[in-house]
Amino acid sequence: MCGMSRWLVPLILSLFSGAAHAAWTYLGNLDGDTVLYDKSTLVQKKRNATIWMLTNFGNVTAQDVLSMSKWLEFDCDKNKFRYLAVYGYEGQMQTGARLIFNPNPTEWGPVQTGSVIQSIQNFACLRYPLLPKK
């Protein structure tokens, strides 16, 4: 059993650090904050889709974070979304200490027309190609 724990702990830790090594794609800039998403994390199951997004804040937030990664789930038929997990970091691009750790799904909410969430939903639900905003 001791031999198994030597490789099991590093394996588990590497699974949880995967989001930090994501291939982020630029989506746009909103009020000084940069929004990115990771195409490689897109998973579609029936009419639901999940994907990771990352926000790099232009200034430190009230929670003392400079970046926040969110795992989104979309109900493509009902035009709703929720966060499956939210993590906040003291540095941009998920660097530094993780100050926010919330692996609990939120309640479903409506996707607002013209929002960043809607842009990601359009890609995740294959409604049309995702175009970066200028």
Predicted regions and their residues:
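N-terminal secretory-pathway/extracellular module detecting exported/lumenal segments
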Residues: A19-K134
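Bacterial N-terminal signal peptides
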Residues: V9-F16
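Bacterial N-terminal signal peptides that target proteins for export
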Residues: M1-L8
